[in-house]
From Swiss-Prot:
Record flagged with keyword ATP-binding: no
Cellular component terms per the entry's GO annotation: cytoplasm
Its job: Has an important function as a repair enzyme for proteins that have been inactivated by oxidation. Catalyzes the reversible oxidation-reduction of methionine sulfoxide in proteins to methionine.
Native organism: Corynebacterium glutamicum (strain ATCC 13032 / DSM 20300 / JCM 1318 / BCRC 11384 / CCUG 27702 / LMG 3730 / NBRC 12168 / NCIMB 10025 / NRRL B-2784 / 534)
E.C. code: 1.8.4.11
Gene name as annotated: msrA
Membership in a protein family: Belongs to the MsrA Met sulfoxide reductase family.
Protein's name according to its UniProt entry: Peptide methionine sulfoxide reductase MsrA
Length: 217
């Protein structure tokens, strides 16, 4: 019997990436179906945001909109090269993007560290370009912020969790941490937005390591 294994995903380069579209795939998004808040703002004074990738974005968005202090979520693509990509293009692995949830939150009610920790606990950040059976560069673990100060705060939580995972026999964390502009985040198509509210029995995989992060609530 012959065994066949798919090649490991490889990150596309800027020169190899698809050119993308001239216009966003979702230009006038409807309000959030659960929270009722605008998907693209305007935001309230003091609200902050972070972009989080933990694998398939459907379940991740639901997890965050259920958290106290989170006042807006949407799903989209970031971290790559192709402007205004479609879902199909992202799934081809030729855009460099990962599936992302934008989380808008009130820092007086929930901290950046709590948001990061919840994400780390909800997936396996040591899996590289995959989460469970979802394989591809678009499923990589990632946290993107608007400034270096927030990125440093994210890194501190991720690094500490990495040490905890090592003590439990896991490998190195592969989570990508970076600073992006809001214009580097591209909304996904309408049917992806609040997908599990529209489709309660939809696909919602869980790939948690079961190891707590240890950030105080």
């Amino acid at each position: 019997m012959a065994w066949f294994f798919a090649p490991e995903p490889v990150m596309v380069t800027a020169d190899e990436a698809l050119k993308g579209g001239r216009h966003p795939v979702l230009e006038n998004p409807a309000p959030h179906t659960v929270l009722g808040t605008p998907v693209t703002g305007p935001w309230k004074e003091g609200q902050q945001r972070i972009w989080i990738g933990l694998g398939c974005f459907w379940g991740v968005e639901q997890m965050y909109w259920q958290m106290d202090g989170v006042e807006g979520t949407s799903v989209g693509y970031a971290g790559g090269f192709t402007p205004n990509p479609t879902y199909r293009e992202v799934c081809s692995g030729r855009t460099g993007h990962t599936e992302i949830v934008e989380v808008v939150y009130d820092p007086s009610k929930i901290s950046l560290e709590q948001l990061v920790a919840r994400g780390l606990e909800a997936h396996d950040p040591t899996q590289g370009f995959r989460q469970g059976n979802d394989v591809g560069t678009q499923y990589r673990s990632a946290y993107y912020t608007e400034n270096e100060e927030d990125a440093a705060r994210v890194k501190a939580v991720v690094d500490a969790y990495g040490e905890t995972l090592k003590q439990h026999g896991f490998g190195e964390i592969t989570t990508e941490i970076g600073v992006i502009s809001p214009s580097d985040y591209f909304l996904a198509e309408d049917y992806h937005q609040q997908y599990l509210d529209k489709n309660p029995d939809g696909y919602c995989p869980h790939h948690s390591t079961g190891i707590p992060c240890g950030v105080e609530a």
